[in-house]
């Protein structure tokens, strides 16, 4: 299976068969975030049943082999800032802005209407 044929959650799971169960769960949860919405590392950790594993979520997303199909750019810190190295954070900011998310002073103002 190649990246261009991935359309469904099942496709993502099949493509990620070489990842750990935790990494697969994180990437599948991230795959579900719709355009124009964001989530946080903590919320993803909670969704996959590991509420204190938000740093592990960030680590799994850093190794995302399916970007932008699995839109890791839509996952931010709980304070609305973009995690990771500045160069990667800037690229993620640009992608999120193109999707219609408002950024003020380098961070997203997290509200219920954009939170997934």
PLM features: what roles do these ranges have?
Residues 3-116:
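Nucleic acid-binding interface residues in structured DNA/RNA-binding domains
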